[in-house]
């Protein structure tokens, strides 16, 4: 008795034909069945393999059927948008591996050089050509295989990975600005210096800059360009409503990296103690804030509009010249080529408190330009007087644009000059008069762009 039964001679069931269904009823029935099966498999794939699946189907009536493993709909739309923009990062994607790699030195040829790579694999169904000897009747049965192709895309950098640079907020009403030179003591700054290539002619601003810079307001000896600063043409200074004395800001470390260049103890006894001012910007030390327009009058400290000094700066008349001095002489005094110093004699200088001229009369003028009498800086832009206890300071800042670092006398130490070394005619009740100090306001050797002289009455 033969234990092994003979092989079955019954023909095997033919493979299912994959062809277009012409009958509308059968087509709708097959669509519903296959659609539910596809969605079921997509759900199983998302649960078993931690995959995010979105299935989108358009039927013959152009109706859309969508399944998403991500809920709610916003996450589904975000997933589709990621694919359209290629805004995702694939973990260690491998490119086409070359089997003929001679050594390990060429492994980087098939690995991505850029870490931010989006890998997209596209699948397609193609007929299988394995049965080349099949009869014509067998060709009616579809034999296909699934093939895939992978492409790599460089993804855009996200905002969180961008290098954080301190932004500069500019109000809408401020339309015109002047580029200011950088201080040589500034370190680690990301703000570009004044516009222009200072190779041969430092007084010619760059044509690509959108800001107007008066050539006479730039000093070639005081304009510096840092090696580590990105080259950008548009430099907009930081606007601050209040000026504080150097070293008095509570958040000094966050606002500037400027250090003192000289110690108060190292200064000679004949020179008053000097404090340095800054503008609360990381790239500017000793520069000035903006002053109002000549036609706007006095600014209320509570008002927000601040108009910088524009191209009409050269048309401002000097405030301290005698009335009988003609306009031609005024221009000669303040010509950039004429180094003549302006001499202003206050008739009652010795009677002024603390040796300072009245706030509305004292103006610090550079050789580049002068300020008009009605161009008075608002009080909120003056020195913060709360930190000075010995001798309060009251000074205005009408025309400091165009100068770089300026050291001003903010505190007078009368005890620093022994009275025994001063002639008797310059002592009043044993105390030196103000005329002893008045010529020491500005160090002309350090800052040649500021030209001021005072004579005792």
Curated annotation (Swiss-Prot):
GO terms for cellular component: cytosol; M/G1 phase-specific MADS box-forkhead transcription factor complex. GO terms for molecular function: DNA-binding transcription activator activity, RNA polymerase II-specific; DNA-binding transcription factor activity, RNA polymerase II-specific; protein dimerization activity; RNA polymerase II cis-regulatory region sequence-specific DNA binding. Residues 199-216 have a biased composition (Low complexity). It comes from the Eukaryota. Transmembrane segments: none annotated. Residues 11-71 form the MADS-box domain. Coiled coil: none annotated. Residues 218-234, 295-317 have a biased composition (Polar residues). PROSITE patterns: MADS_BOX_1 (PS00350), MADS_BOX_2 (PS50066). Pfam families: SRF-TF (PF00319). Residues 195-278, 295-328 are annotated as: Disordered. The modification Phosphoserine is found at residue 372. Phosphorylated. Occurs periodically during mitosis. It is found in: Nucleus. Keywords: Activator, Cell cycle, Cell division, DNA-binding, Mitosis, Nucleus, Phosphoprotein, Transcription, Transcription regulation. The keyword Aminoacyl-tRNA synthetase does not apply. GO terms for biological process: cell division; positive regulation of transcription by RNA polymerase II. Residues 265-278 have a biased composition (Basic residues). PANTHER family: SERUM RESPONSE FACTOR HOMOLOG. Acts as a transcriptional activator with a role in the regulation of mitosis. Regulates septation and the periodic transcription of cdc15. This is MADS-box transcription factor 1. The gene is mbx1.
